[in-house]
């Protein structure tokens, strides 16, 4: 299946409103308004998810997947502009799995559901903070399903937050310790084994690199939550060494928040450049 850039650039125009296409039967029984768009809420395997319907779906049904924090900083992310371009916007909550094998299995069913709806085989992912962990884990497990990744202050180290140094916000250390216990339980290892776990994104760059999945990452130099030196700096170095593709937007004076950009158009442009039109 092929897209052409002109088709997506026309999404939302009168030309699109007159084009006939098969109706999509969305999952779930609840439809709500979300930033002026129609959002279809559903449950899968007892977990909540949603699909936001673009006013005029583009040919081939391209889609954008927010891995985590789907309600955070939405206008600063690519989500709304991509909806106007005809992309569907989707989310599936697997946060408490930290994308262990159970989480991957849920997302595999989610992906099959999207394919049954006729969506394009590859989506583009947004991974903010913990969403980076989910995005990179999914892309490593199923690189054939990912066209590109926009990452933002991403978690790349399963053992993140365990370091005790001046860069880590003191008020977050207790929370990090509790989170580490949960992550260790999810992966069935000891806390001290999290950083060296073979599925930690820092240690599992090769599938993403070999698939040449393009990544655009916002790095925040003053981040005291997800320390760049233990996360994206390690990940990007190893990814490049493995032949991967990553572009870093370095914001040396920014902290962990806010995610996204005042004008998210550069993020949209990155996605449109790398979606398989």
Which functions belong to the PLM regions below?
Residues 5-59:
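N-terminal cap/lid segment of alpha/beta-hydrolase-fold proteins
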Residues 73-90:
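Short amphipathic alpha-helix adjacent to the substrate-entry channel of hydrolases
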Residues 98-118, 137:
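Alpha/beta-hydrolase active-site loop
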Residues 118-129:
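Alpha/beta-hydrolase fold nucleophile elbow
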Residues 127-137:
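Glycine-rich nucleophile elbow surrounding the catalytic serine of serine-hydrolase chemistry
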Residues 137-191:
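Hydrolase active-site cap/lid region
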Residues 170-233, 237-240:
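The feature captures the conserved acid-bearing segment of alpha/beta-hydrolase catalytic domains
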Residues 225, 230-277:
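C-terminal catalytic histidine-bearing segment of alpha/beta-hydrolase fold enzymes
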């Amino acid at each position: 299946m092929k897209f052409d850039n002109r088709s997506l650039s026309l999404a939302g125009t009168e030309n699109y409103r007159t084009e006939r296409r098969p109706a999509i039967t969305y999952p779930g029984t609840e439809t709500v308004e979300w930033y002026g768009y129609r959002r279809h809420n559903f449950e899968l395997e007892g977990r909540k998810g949603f699909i936001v319907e673009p006013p005029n779906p583009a040919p081939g049904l391209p889609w954008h997947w927010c891995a985590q924090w789907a309600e955070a900083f939405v206008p600063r992310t690519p989500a709304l502009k991509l909806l106007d371009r005809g992309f569907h916007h989707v989310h599936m909550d697997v946060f408490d799995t930290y994308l262990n094998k159970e989480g991957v299995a849920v997302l595999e069913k989610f992906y099959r559901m999207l394919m049954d709806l006729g969506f394009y085989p590859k989506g583009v992912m947004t991974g903010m903070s913990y969403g980076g962990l989910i995005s990179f884990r999914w892309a490593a497990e199923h690189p054939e399903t990912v066209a590109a990744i926009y990452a933002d202050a991403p978690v790349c180290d399963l053992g993140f937050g365990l370091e005790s140094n001046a860069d880590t916000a003191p008020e977050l250390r207790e929370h990090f310790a509790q989170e580490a216990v949960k992550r260790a339980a999810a992966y069935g290892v000891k806390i001290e084994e999290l950083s060296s776990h073979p599925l930690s994104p820092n240690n599992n760059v090769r599938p993403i690199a070999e698939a040449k999945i393009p990544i655009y990452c916002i790095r925040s130099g003053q981040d005291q939550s997800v320390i760049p030196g233990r996360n994206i700096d390690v990940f990007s170095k190893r990814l490049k060494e493995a032949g991967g593709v990553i572009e870093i937007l370095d914001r040396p004076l920014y902290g962990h928040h806010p995610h996204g950009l005042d004008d998210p158009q550069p993020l949209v442009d990155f996605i449109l450049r790398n979606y398989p039109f």
